[in-house]
Structures are given as structure tokens and as C-alpha cells.
Regions:
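S-adenosyl-L-methionine
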Residues: 1-27, 35-42
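Class I S-adenosyl-L-methionine
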Residues: 137-186
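A short glycine-rich, Lys/Arg-flanked "PGG" loop and its adjoining helix->strand segment in the class I
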Residues: 107-121
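Conserved beta-strand signature within the Rossmann-like core of class I S-adenosyl-L-methionine
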Residues: 122-129
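Conserved SAM-binding strand-loop segment of SAM-dependent methyltransferases
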Residues: 68-77
Length: 186
């Protein structure tokens, strides 16, 4: 866990107390600079907001300024910490690139199983895509969005609404609400 420039280790008891003090938990994967997490935590003080990113340096500024209900975890999206199992009622992935985007496009088993593991039953998963990042990986925006939608559906996620593109903004939001297929919970 990072707070400003300090890396902290939170023991199981402290983490349990932090989690039990919040009925709703948002986990943002690939949180980048942490602005989304900081802003979300400030807007919803009754919700625990956890940002996960592999790059420690990006998180320093916003983790220092974040409210107490924000937690920043240094971890790779392809190897999510076990402590997050069945915690999230909402998971967000905002503008993925690199290995996170590749994992979504290819259905990387570690990423997909990690998503399944951290989500509570009927959790929502919201993914916002960047056309430029998709283009760098050889995918037009609409085709990349459809590919990710198909990968998630084939992995056993129950899709409640179809994907839709906000073409004028170059961003695709997909899917807005997902729940896990009941038979696939560990």
C-alpha cells in the first residue's frame, strides 16, 4: 500500500477493520495516477475505494492527498492480491493500456480469474476504453470493444446490458453492469 512516498504494509487485522467499516467497495484496476480513486473516495465517504496499479511512482501525489476511505495498492492486474477476494461490489478499469489491455483483448486467464475472484456476486464491472491505446495494439475502437465484450461473455460473465460506443468522444463504455455466472464462483 502506498500513501504519498511511503510504502506501508497493512496487517490482516487493520485491513479487516478498514473493510468492515464500509458496506460498499469499489476496486479500480490499472488506476494510473490515482485521480479517479481519490475523487471517487471524496464523493462517496461511505464507500472504500481501492486503486491498484503496478507503477508506484504514478500513485504518489494522489495517494498523499486522498481521503481515509481511499487505499492504493501496488500490484499487477494479472496477479491481484488474495486479500481482495470477494470484496468488490463495483470494479472499474479506466482506459487500460499495455498488459492490462492485452489481457482484456486475449482473455488472459490470470486477469479474468482475478476479476472473478475479487468481485462479489452481482458486482458491476465498468470498462472505459481509449481508441488510441487500442489502435496501438492493432484494434479499431469498435472492434476492440466488441472483442473485449465477447471475451468477457465467453469467460462466464453474465452481461446485463450490451456494450455501446460514444464514438464522438473516442471512448467505449462496456458493459455497464456485469454479474458472474453462478457456477463459476470459487
Amino acid at each position: 500500500v502506498i500513501r504519498g512516498k511511503q510504502t506501508l504494509v497493512i496487517d490482516e487485522s487493520h485491513f479487516g477493520n478498514l473493510v468492515s467499516g464500509h458496506k460498499c467497495i469499489l476496486i479500480d484496476i490499472g488506476t494510473g495516477d490515482g485521480y479517479f480513486v481519490r475523487h471517487s473516495a471524496a464523493k462517496t465517504p461511505d464507500r472504500l475505494v481501492i486503486g491498484i496499479d503496478a507503477c508506484r511512482g504514478n500513485l504518489c501525489d494522489n495517494s498523499r492527498k486522498a481521503p481515509q476511505n481511499a487505499l492504493f495498492v501496488i500490484a499487477n492486474a494479472l496477479s491481484l492480491p488474495g486479500e481482495l477476494t470477494n470484496l468488490a461490489d463495483r470494479v472499474t478499469i479506466n482506459f487500460p493500456w499495455g498488459s492490462l489491455l492485452s489481457g482484456l483483448l486475449t482473455g488472459d486467464a490470470a486477469l479474468i480469474s482475478g476479476l472473478f475472484r475479487i468481485m462479489r456476486l452481482q458486482a458491476s464491472l465498468e470498462i472505459s476504453l481509449n481508441g488510441g491505446a487500442l489502435a496501438e495494439q492493432g484494434w479499431p475502437l469498435e472492434e476492440g470493444a466488441e472483442r473485449i465484450f465477447r471475451v468477457l461473455k465467453e469467460s462466464g460473465l453474465r452481461l446485463n446490458r450490451a456494450a455501446h460506443a460514444a464514438r464522438s468522444q473516442g471512448v467505449t463504455f462496456l458493459p455497464e453492469h456485469l454479474g458472474q455466472a453462478a457456477g463459476l464462483w470459487p
